[in-house]
Design a protein with these regions (language model features):
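Charged substrate- and nucleic-acid-binding regions of tRNA-handling and nucleotidyl-transfer enzymes
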Residues: 47-139
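Histidine/acidic-rich helix-loop-helix segments that form or flank divalent-metal centers
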Residues: 1-54, 72
Length: 139
């Protein structure tokens, strides 16, 4: 219930870019994203302002269907790598950094689902670590 209350007003004006929606939906998961679309539609209809199709809910459903057809991972578990893989690839100990990298990989694959392969995820993870290291050296 808290999740629904917190997110049912997300992108109320239907102005979020598809890339932004993809990343958000991957973070929320497929079922929860559909549920929020349903709640959005019910909320708008309940207000009496619109009786027909609710543009944002319809757009979300279409995008979610497309994402599902493309094989977008809707959870960190659906990525074709594990935290252990990331630790091995990057010679990292178990730490919050591993989870941060995995979350970034999920966001990336929400937009570029074809990159959800072990080889591509390894390269992306290495690039992320290298970029973070460069950023730390600038401080």
């Amino acid at each position: 219930v808290c999740f629904i209350v917190r997110h049912h007003m997300y992108d109320l004006n239907n102005t979020a870019k598809d890339k932004t929606l993809r990343r958000t939906f991957a973070r929320w998961g497929f079922e929860r994203s559909l549920e929020i679309a349903d709640i959005r539609e019910a909320d708008v209809h309940g207000s009496g302002i619109i009786t027909g199709e609710v543009e944002s809910a319809a757009r979300w459903r279409i995008l979610l269907q497309k994402m599902q057809q493309e094989g977008v991972p809707f959870s960190a578990r659906a990525l074709n790598c594990s935290g252990a893989d990331i630790m091995n690839w990057l010679s990292l100990p178990a730490s919050p950094a591993v989870g941060k990298i995995k979350a970034a990989l999920l966001a990336h694959c929400a937009v570029y689902p074809a990159d959800n392969t072990p080889a591509r995820l390894k390269k992306l993870a290495c690039d992320m670590l290298h970029r973070d290291t460069q950023d730390e050296n600038r401080l």
